[in-house]
């Protein structure tokens, strides 16, 4: 498994993807992505960083089936409405957008898209909402992503939504690797929560 991840991370890097985009594509942290890429370079073989503590989440069996995506989006929608009425669904690019699109249909809500910091060349900035989708000003929103790894993207999305005049009601995700209950006073609900034992 590790060698396949190293090869895939290197392949994506060679295609020009940023560290953040590779992390998003493989559902791993940016630290893990950097470590994997370093494994393929002979220059860094002598001074490798300590192996990060992370899990790779592969949900391709869900993502490759529109009916499975529908079922998962329905479950995420069900968790969202437990918190209240939603005006718009904000999908975190890239992998949160398919869920958000289906959820917006289920919830009869508008669709917005958030581009996280990790997809930008200048990672000292903050994420941004796409202008090609719904304006979320004065709307109650649910924020959707596939996997929480560190929680930084979710926190950034919440802050950007608030800065743009929205009321983030809840965050829903497929998998939470961090074990978060909330971020910036917004509850986080996950279908699967990974907890480390020991």
UniProtKB/Swiss-Prot annotation:
Keyword annotations for this protein, in alphabetical order, are: DNA-binding, Transcription, Transcription regulation
- Keyword field contains Transcription: yes
- Which InterPro entries does this UniProt record tie to the protein? GfcR-like, PRibTrfase_dom, PRTase-like
Under the heading SUPFAM superfamilies, the entry gives: PRTase-like
Can you supply a Gene Ontology BP term from the record?
pyrimidine nucleobase biosynthetic process
What would be one Pfam family of this protein? Pribosyltran
Which Gene Ontology MF annotations are present? DNA binding; orotate phosphoribosyltransferase activity
Query: What does the entry note on its domains?
Result: Contains an N-terminal DNA-binding winged helix-turn-helix domain and a C-terminal regulatory domain (or effector binding domain) resembling phosphoribosyltransferase (PRT) domain.
Q: Which family does it belong to?
A: Belongs to the purine/pyrimidine phosphoribosyltransferase family. GfcR subfamily.
Q: What is this protein called?
A: Transcriptional regulator GfcR
Q: Which source organism?
A: Methanosphaera stadtmanae (strain ATCC 43021 / DSM 3091 / JCM 11832 / MCB-3)
Which gene is annotated as encoding this protein in its UniProt record?
Answer: gfcR
